[in-house]
Design a protein with these regions (language model features):
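Activity-critical C-terminal alpha-helical subdomain
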Residues: 186, 434-495
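A glycine- and small-aliphatic-rich helix-loop capping segment at beta-alpha/alpha-beta transitions
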Residues: 88-106, 134-138, 161-172, 219-225, ...
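N-terminal flexible segment immediately upstream of the FAD-binding catalytic core
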Residues: 1-69, 86-116, 145, 267-276, ...
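Alpha-helix capping/hinge segments and adjacent helical runs
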Residues: 26-27, 417-429, 453-454, 458-465
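Feature of Fe-S/electron-transfer and energy-metabolism proteins
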Residues: 1-15, 35-42, 55-63, 69-73, ...
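C-terminal substrate-recognition/cap domain of FAD-linked oxidoreductases
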Residues: 31-41, 221-225, 231, 235-408, ...
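FAD-binding subdomain of flavoenzyme oxidoreductases
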Residues: 107-261, 479-483, 489-495
Length: 495
């Protein structure tokens, strides 16, 4: 993927920008030396790197607002940065822009158990919210695999899911309110501690907007009571396709587990070597299922689940006998991504979502593509809601390997759309899927999205070059369109 050269006219504003930023932030919160910027060259997609012109680390909403007013006045682009764990290049810096990193905004501002919510700054990690209320018997439901590191602000920007999103929903289903700083520094508040508010669902619009509409500075999250009982099932299958069909069978039987995850042979081996979760090494696939709720209900659901799994061809079924064993089952799954480092120098992670009934077909096609491209694939994903995460293993030191992985990844995502699915489930579009947006959306769809973007950010200064596969500023909007699924002037830079 081509990354553009920085605009000399913008680079010429660096000295003025740094001087103005130092007037509203302490020196340690304004980074502009080459050494300091290295840590911000990329997000979780390390294949694409580009150092920003500068990085600022505001500590409050007021400081974010002051920063945005300065950068807006200088007409410099801004890239919001949470924890840098994103997997679509959504936080990839701009060489002629400023990264606004929110790591210093990591305070839990309020815990209101009477109303079942907490108010937190965007730099608070996902897992820390649950840790803060665990002794009171509460927790925050969305649990991405990176929950010990990823920030709640980033979760909102990407509308992150997690292992338990099948039953409890993704980020947008667990939010009550947001505070956002717009491109010109204006502060916007939407929602609150009440369940709903009149008017348009602006909170729903901002959630998943990938930093294109504003910078999240405060989040009110919904807290849930911990279920009385939670138990996990580990089922072994002879093929990945059979495990995929079992997922559809369980849901068709009228059950909605808290979580359903599939891992194939390669993912099993890597995760077991890394996490020692007791996974059956050498088996083709495992399906993890968790039921939670009152103990009597969970026991009944486990019995029904076992019947369905055996009918679907499960060769072995284990049910967690203790909380320690349940957590161990999930520890292996959540270690899958970092475990890939033991078997491959690099991986390229896809994020398409498909109807559950198409799981077997799509998994079979991915197996075929793996052979065609001569790239190993480790499948590990949220099976309950059809959110695929095939990890394409490659070596970035070998010329052409990254490009081959990109091409194969594009074919997988197109396949997801072809069977009635979508390009992304929780990782976002970023730059990774940007040029595939024309495959899922027509010209009118993209026009509507661009109009929304322009209404919030008329100068296109917030995270430019992400999500939209067209080269245009909002002032030029309407002068260039997509025809026949293709972008005109493809040779032009798109940042």
């Amino acid at each position: 993927m081509h990354l553009p050269e920085p605009d000399p006219a913008r680079l010429a504003k660096k000295e003025a920008a740094v001087k103005a930023l130092l007037a509203v932030l302490p020196r340690e919160c304004v980074l502009h030396s080459a050494e300091d910027l290295i840590a911000y060259e990329c997000d979780g997609v390390s294949a694409y790197r580009q150092a920003p012109m500068a990085v600022v680390l505001p500590r409050s909403t007021d400081e974010v607002s002051a920063v945005m007013k300065i950068l807006h006045g200088l007409e410099l682009p801004v890239v919001p940065w949470g924890a840098g764990t994103g997997l679509s290049g959504g936080a990839l810096p701009l060489g002629d822009g400023v990264t606004v990193a929110l790591a210093k905004m990591r305070r839990i501002l309020d815990i209101d158990l009477d109303n079942g919510c907490a108010v937190v700054q965007p730099g608070v990690t996902n897992a820390r919210i649950s840790q803060a209320v665990a002794t009171e018997g509460f927790y925050y439901a969305p649990d991405p695999s990176s929950q010990i590191a990823c920030s709640i602000g980033g979760n909102v920007a990407e509308n992150s899911g997690g292992v338990h999103c099948l039953k409890y929903g993704v980020t947008t289903n667990n939010l009550l309110g947001l505070e956002v700083v717009l491109a010109d520094g204006e502060v916007l508040r939407v929602g609150g501690k009440s369940l709903d508010a009149p008017g348009y669902d602006l909170m729903g619009l901002l959630t998943g907007s990938e930093g294109l509409l504003g910078i999240i500075t405060e989040v009110t999250v919904r807290l849930l009571r911990k279920p009385e009982t939670a138990r996990a099932v580990l089922a072994v299958f002879d093929t990945v396709e059979a495990s995929g069909q079992a997922v559809a069978d369980v849901i068709a039987a009228g059950m909605v587990p808290a979580g359903m995850e599939i891992m194939d042979k390669l993912a099993i081996e890597a995760s077991e070597d890394y996490a020692k979760a007791g996974y059956p090494v050498g088996k083709e696939a495992i399906l993890l299922i968790e039921h939670d709720g009152p103990e009597v209900e969970v026991d009944y659901l486990l019995q029904r689940t076992e019947v369905v799994l055996r009918a679907a061809g499960a060769t072995e079924i284990r049910v967690s006998k203790s909380e320690k064993e349940r957590l161990l089952f999930w520890a292996g799954r959540k270690a899958a991504f970092p475990a890939m480092g033991r078997i491959s120098p690099d991986y390229y992670c896809m994020d398409g979502t498909i109807p559950r009934g198409a799981l077997a077909k799509v998994l079979g096609k991915i197996r075929e593509l793996s052979g065609s491209y001569d790239l190993r694939v480790a499948n590990v994903f949220h099976a309950g809601d059809g959110n695929l995460h095939p990890l394409l293993l490659y070596d970035g030191n070998v010329p052409g390997e990254l490009e081959k992985a990109e091409q194969m990844g594009a074919e997988i995502l197109k396949l997801c759309v072809d069977v009635g699915g979508v390009l992304t489930g929780e990782h976002g579009v970023g730059i990774e899927k940007r040029d595939l947006m024309t495959y899922q959306f027509n010209e009118r769809d993209l026009d509507a999205m661009q109009y929304v973007k322009c209404s919030f950010d008329a100068e296109s200064l917030l995270n430019p070059g992400k999500m939209f596969p067209v080269l245009r500023r909002c002032a030029e909007f309407g002068s260039m369109h997509i025809h026949g699924g293709k972008v005109p002037f493809p040779e032009l830079e798109r940042f």
